[in-house]
Amino acid sequence: MDDKWKIEYYKTKSKKSPVEEFILNLDVKTQNKIVDALALLKEFGVTLSLPHVKKVTETSLWELRIIGKNNIRFFYIARTEKTFLILHGFQKKKQKTDKREIKVALERLADY
């Protein structure tokens, strides 16, 4: 039996995946870093900690941090059945995370 966690991506009602589209529009080197980070998340699940993941204050969201020059971030939640739902991906441009990015993830969670 496979003990690894599973990854799901948020999909709109029309079955589009904005997170996967975001990833596909990044350069290959960054995509490879994302694959590596997602592999860590699948392997270690909720026990993965800084510098890879961080709890988003005052929300149910967690932030997966892709270390590198592009500062890529993903907001996700842990669901039952050992599954993570990736809600939103973005490039962090400032020290503090833009509240609009958190809002997008929370709206997608409510839509899910």
Tell me the role of every PLM-derived stretch.
Residues 1-71, 80-84, 92-112:
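Basic, Lys/Arg-enriched alpha-helical interface segments
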Residues 75-76:
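GIY-YIG nuclease signature motif recognition
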Residues 87:
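Conserved catalytic cores of phosphodiester-cleaving nucleases, focusing on short active-site segments
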